Amino acid sequence: MPENAQVIMRYGPYSSIGLPVEHRTYRLEGLLAVLAEDGHQVLLEKIEDWNVVELMVNGEVVFRCNIKDLEFGGDGKLDPLCREARIAVLNAY
């Protein structure tokens, strides 16, 4: 994947510690940081599927996971899912 590619991050609502279900970006911070570090432009798009995060490159989903499996906050460098997502984006064409 060329540097400065556009990545669409689609994310759904989730419930956190008894709070109502809604779209939150706290668990996306590490993933956003990892992709920004590689120079990618990331557009956030809300979807209605609960607990889902998808990364799309060139109209194709290259990575998908449960949003609750991502680490809360942080820079994403120690999160294995962020590493997996980064590799998926870099390998996308």
Curated annotation (Swiss-Prot):
InterPro entries tied to this protein: UPF0728 (IPR027885)
Pfam families referenced in this protein's UniProt entry, alphabetically: UPF0728 (PF15092)
Lineage top rank: taxon: Eukaryota
Stated family: Belongs to the UPF0728 family.
Stated name of the protein: UPF0728 protein C10orf53 homolog
Species this protein is from: Bos taurus (Bovine)
